[in-house]
Amino acid sequence: MSVIKMTDLDLAGKRVFIRADLNVPVKDGKVTSDARIRASLPTIELALKQGAKVMVTSHLGRPTEGEYNEEFSLLPVVNYLKDKLSNPVRLVKDYLDGVEVAAGELVVLENVRFNKGEKKDDEALSKKYAALCDVFVMDAFGTAHRAQASTHGIGKFADVACAGPLLAAELDALGKALKEPARPMVAIVGGSKVSTKLTVLDSLSKIADQLIVGGGIANTFVAAQGHNVGKSLYEADLVDEAKRLLSTCDIPVPTDVRVATEFSETATATLKSVNDIKDDEQILDLGDVSAQKLADILKNAKTILWNGPVGVFEFPNFRKGTEIVANAIADSEGFSIAGGGDTLAAIDLFGIADKISYISTGGGAFLEFVEGKVLPAVAMLEERAKQ
């Protein structure tokens, strides 16, 4: 993958426009989870250290496009950055007709979604963004799968368009896991729906030596083996698709599970064989035997790609399966890469972040890259590198 990297450029005195992913949860004007800002800080600090005139922007939430809405302002992000950086930081609301930035100063440009045409990759808006800078740095892997004015359009018109350190690291890590993985390679696909991850399962079945399914996805495979899944979340119309996958690749289907008669945090967990599920029960976690079987597979893996939990780990009574699997990944000596919001929440809960080789900041972009789809922002950077 050939792109210009920000780390290869001299940024001194240059106007640098960084598109970061600062889309963080905010409550009462305060950032409640700073993982994405923390991940972006090294890029911002590197540009400031080089004496660049630095602008950074992002989207935050889903405001009505083209309208300012205080609820979705980047002000809480600015306040967070002021605490972390020794450089001056200020928020600018109206910047499309130009903005003055001093060398060594950080200007945060207000939420890009307040600009009409952002999501449609509007050419006139893209050109206005491009006119603000000498160097455009795309560093938001989480939005690289969307062709929008601040992630894609600007890059076509900026004098220089490059990949930031975070984006470059994401692409390197995913390339390492998918292009030439150390073997055996194990891929875990969990979460609730087969339909949204079917193409991912299909793509991975061609790369991975071992495919593991968990969560609601696994329930569809349990049903495909002819078991009653009661009130469990599963997709009846995809049972045949699950059967096809089972016939073409080795997928361990749970043999024991934890069930409940209601979907709630206080529901009682009952451990039982998949042969004994009643009509009023729903599968909410893997059983100990099934979870341990997966842990044994993971122990010997040289590459692990993890997307999605294997049970409703948010409920303490249905956490054990995901915990066993998470700890097995943490203890593995292989290269592990994890992505997706629920996966990151599980990593935080079990305190294993330092034991995962690479944690991807992208959800949708992570999955689309795994599927082998072209990410528009990355394709644009490759195109610009050829010019």
Curated annotation (Swiss-Prot):
Organism of this sequence = Klebsiella pneumoniae (strain 342)
Q: Which molecular-function annotation in GO is an example for this chain? A: ATP binding
Q: Which family does it belong to?
A: Belongs to the phosphoglycerate kinase family.
- Name where it mostly resides: cytoplasm
GO BP terms, alphabetized: gluconeogenesis; glycolytic process
Presence of the UniProt keyword Transferase in the record: yes
Subcellular location(s) of the protein: Cytoplasm
Originating gene: pgk
GO CC aspect terms: cytosol
The name this protein carries in UniProt is Phosphoglycerate kinase
Which key words are in the record?
ATP-binding, Cytoplasm, Glycolysis, Kinase, Nucleotide-binding, Transferase
InterPro entries noted in UniProt: Phosphoglycerate_kinase, Phosphoglycerate_kinase_CS, Phosphoglycerate_kinase_N, Phosphoglycerate_kinase_sf
Question: Does this entry carry the keyword Lyase?
Answer: no
